[in-house]
């Protein structure tokens, strides 16, 4: 392929801006559930992720293990995305977010307000309430939400520049259970930053979401619970790159019937039809 100057100057498809930061990895990764701190560090480095999610509860433990964990996170030179994991009300999430801003010195917050302990589904009412307050308080809210289009609209109206709909319940590894809904959100908000959060279990799930036009992937369990987290981190790095480049290139149109890929010119006449 001959690259014109226009093509040559085009920035890498991997480059994107989220929360005011320009990054070169579309993968956001969690810091929990790893078999050891060393496995966590190795897996995150292998994944190439530039954003790491952390829990205020983990950092606030105050013991030596908590300090070791935090020092290791800082050594990764990644942007920290604090979360409100474990919160079940807007009030609780708002308080946690405000504390996280002081501890981690960032206005980013991954907003989680869980409404059901059975499948860890977000509470849409409390999530929206917390979002409105935190946006007004100067936070860049990364809301963990469902794939409901109306809720997505309300969150955008509340001031969200980013949406993070789930692929499937947290930790389930079931991938994208409702591609139709996810695609509807993408089509409804073509310019918004969209990140699939939760349910990613395999690298192929990440590829599917990115081929759909989603901007990023947030995962934790898929890497942390792999028998080999470091190798799985590498696998997701490659998968995310494949998905982004595939979307940028554009995939072929599906056909109902076969279409020969080999031309018949020069084929012996007795093989031509």
Curated annotation (Swiss-Prot):
Pathway: Cofactor biosynthesis; thiamine diphosphate biosynthesis. It holds the Pfam family ThiG. SUPFAM superfamilies: ThiG-like (SSF110399). GO terms for biological process: thiamine diphosphate biosynthetic process. InterPro entries: Aldolase_TIM (IPR013785), Thiazole_synthase_ThiG (IPR033983), ThiG (IPR008867). Keywords: Cytoplasm, Schiff base, Thiamine biosynthesis, Transferase. The active site is at residue 110. GO terms for cellular component: cytoplasm. Its EC number is 2.8.1.10. Disulfide bonds: none annotated. Belongs to the ThiG family. Catalyzes the rearrangement of 1-deoxy-D-xylulose 5-phosphate (DXP) to produce the thiazole phosphate moiety of thiamine. Sulfur is provided by the thiocarboxylate moiety of the carrier protein ThiS. In vitro, sulfur can be provided by H(2)S. Homotetramer. Forms heterodimers with either ThiH or ThiS. This is Thiazole synthase. It comes from Hydrogenovibrio crunogenus (strain DSM 25203 / XCL-2) (Thiomicrospira crunogena).
């Amino acid at each position: 392929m001959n690259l014109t100057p226009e093509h040559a100057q085009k920035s890498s498809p991997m480059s994107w801006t989220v929360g005011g930061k320009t990054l070169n990895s579309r993968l956001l990764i969690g810091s929990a559930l790893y078999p050891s701190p060393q496995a966590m560090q190795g897996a995150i480095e292998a994944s190439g992720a530039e954003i790491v999610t952390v829990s205020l509860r983990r950092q606030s433990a105050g013991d030596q293990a908590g300090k070791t964990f935090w020092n290791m996170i800082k050594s990764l030179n990644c942007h920290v995305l604090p979360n409100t994991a474990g919160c079940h009300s807007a009030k609780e999430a708002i308080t946690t977010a405000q504390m996280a801003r002081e501890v981690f010195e960032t206005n980013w917050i991954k907003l989680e307000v869980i409404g059901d302990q059975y499948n860890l589904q977000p509470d849409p009412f409390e999530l929206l309430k917390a979002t409105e307050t935190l946006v007004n308080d100067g936070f860049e809210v990364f809301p963990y939400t469902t794939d409901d289009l109306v809720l997505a609209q309300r969150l955008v109206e509340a001031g969200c520049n980013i949406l993070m709909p789930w692929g499937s319940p947290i930790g389930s590894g079931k991938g994208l259970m409702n591609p139709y809904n996810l695609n509807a959100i993408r089509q409804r908000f073509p310019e918004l930053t969209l990140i699939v959060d939760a349910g990613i279990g395999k690298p192929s799930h990440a590829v599917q979401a990115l081929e759909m036009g989603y901007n990023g992937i947030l995962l934790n369990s898929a890497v942390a619970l792999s028998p080999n987290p470091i190798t799985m981190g590498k696998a997701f790095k490659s998968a995310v790159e494949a998905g982004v480049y595939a979307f940028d290139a554009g995939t072929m149109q599906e056909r109902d019937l076969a279409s020969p890929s080999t031309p018949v010119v020069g084929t012996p006449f007795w093989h031509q039809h």
